[in-house]
Swiss-Prot record:
Coiled coil: none
Binding positions (ATP): S43, S44, G45, V46, D47, S48
Organism: Helicobacter hepaticus (strain ATCC 51449 / 3B1)
Keyword Ligase: yes
UniProt-listed InterPro entries: Rossmann-like_a/b/a_fold, TilS/TtcA_N, tRNA_Ile_lys_synt, tRNA_Ile_lys_synt_N
EC number assigned by the record: 6.3.4.19
Protein's UniProt name: tRNA(Ile)-lysidine synthase
Catalytic activity: cytidine(34) in tRNA(Ile2) + L-lysine + ATP = lysidine(34) in tRNA(Ile2) + AMP + diphosphate + H(+)
Length: 423
């Protein structure tokens, strides 16, 4: 008898009833991924293992990916179990081995993990990333952000849409089917079926802030009030989505500058990391939000998160005090009379140096079109990079080396950015 059949025979009447109840709860989430290419972020813990078997029950297509951090002896067994499950149920299993992180382990591990998932999504054309975050996880995040001082934009974590800033790459959707399911229900699900899973011993260490919140507050609250907490988080999510839908950004992509950066970074694997290089200026018209400072701050939150960064309470205060005219981390935040602009300072991040100083004509153009001074060096760098690419592509064309050709080149570039700063 195949192992898959043996798994199905572990059901009894109460198991089947419980599976039906949990399946009913998850049906809306699963309906959207029946015909898609799905990658499951797997850890061999109770959450992702329960999701693995729930996906099997509902005949959802998926493969799995796991990261080996080499921080615990048990991790070898966890990776081996992932491979065993994949082989048993005819799934692909991808494994990444993380380097040693000297500091900020959680942040660096998360970044490495998502880079790994991203590379697989690009290479194998997955459209959805399935994550096993459950209700307790969501409450942990909310309470930790609440104690730091956070607005609606950051209380609920990252959005479910991941945008790649490389046009050649596809965007993908993150699905969290278990987000309204209490963790104790997942323990029950696995226990009643005799499903093996692993417990990460580091989760017991209360010196980690997340673990402290988990054991002192979150688990107790979810065990007592899970239904109400799930509803509240759902309402907050809808409220945030409605607000963020109002905050649609106009964008100006600095494509030539990005190409120059990519040429300079020879030691970075293109499919794994270029999605992080954001050479885009984001903008919103103040009248769109009635010049409401809170909504403009929410816009800043939204753009920062699209770039993989969470603004702190202190940073939000600094943006407000500066009247949206400051630099936060690698973000340039500036404005003119009509608009707010946000861009990553890619020149500083990647040590880009322009070969020629700003021309007088370019300075006049910027002044007449109300281009904020903090953005002018980015636009000039884009022009210099674009000019270099054009001259390289048309090296034999005479018009590019005479005054008339250069004038045509410059006029074409200005036309590209004209409407962005005047409308």
């Amino acid at each position: 008898m195949a192992k898959k059949d043996a798994y199905k025979l572990t059901y009894n009447t109460s198991d089947t009833l419980f599976a039906t109840n949990l399946g009913d709860i998850l049906a809306p989430s699963f309906a959207s991924i029946k015909q898609t290419r799905n990658l499951l972020g797997f850890s061999s813990g109770v959450d992702s293992t329960a999701l693995f078997f729930l996906l099997l029950e509902c005949e959802i297509p998926f493969d799995i990916a796991i990261v080996h951090y080499h921080t615990r002896l048990q991790a070898d067994d966890e990776v081996a179990y992932a491979k065993e499950l994949a082989a048993t149920y005819n799934k692909l299993c991808f494994v990444a081995h993380a380097p040693h992180f000297n500091a900020n382990f959680e942040s660096n591990a998360r970044s490495f993990r998502f880079d790994f998932f991203q590379s697989l999504i690009i290479k194998h054309h997955y459209t959805h990333l399935l994550l096993a975050h459950q209700l307790n996880d969501r409450l942990e995040w909310l309470l930790m952000q609440l104690t730091k001082g956070a607005g609606l934009g950051n209380l609920l974590g990252f959005a479910d849409e991941r945008y790649n800033y490389d046009k050649s790459l596809n965007n993908y959707t993150i699905v969290r089917p278990l987000e309204s399911i209490p963790k104790n229900e997942l323990y029950r699900f696995c226990k009643e079926r005799g499903i093996k899973y692993f417990e990460d011993s580091s989760n017991q260490d209360k010196t980690f802030r997340r673990n402290y919140f988990r054991y002192e507050f979150c688990d107790k609250l979810v065990n007592e009030f899970s239904a109400g907490i799930a509803r509240s988080l759902s309402y907050l999510q809808r409220d945030r989505q409605s607000l963020e839908n109002m905050l649609y950004a106009d964008t100006l992509e600095l494509e030539s500058l990005k190409m120059q950066i990519l040429r300079q970074i020879h030691n970075i694997s293109v499919p794994m990391h270029t999605h992080k290089i954001c050479c885009i200026i984001f903008s919103i018209h103040k009248s769109k939000v009635q010049d409401d400072e809170n909504l403009l701050l929410l816009f800043c939150d939204k753009v920062a998160k699209q770039c993989g960064y969470v603004l702190s309470a202190a940073q939000r205060d600094e943006i407000s005090k500066s009247r949206f005219n400051c630099k936060i981390a690698h973000f340039i935040i500036t404005s003119n009379t009509h608009r707010i602009y946000i861009a990553q300072d890619s020149m500083s991040m990647y040590k880009i140096v322009t070969q020629s100083p700003m021309s007088k004509k370019f300075k006049i153009f910027c002044a007449s079109h109300r281009v904020p001074s903090k953005l002018r060096f980015l636009l000039w760098a884009e022009f210099c990079a674009w000019e270099m690419l054009c001259k390289s592509a048309y090296a034999d064309a005479d018009y590019l080396v005479n005054e008339q050709g250069n004038q045509h080149l410059f006029t074409h570039f200005l036309a590209k950015i004209d409407n962005f700063f005047t409308l």
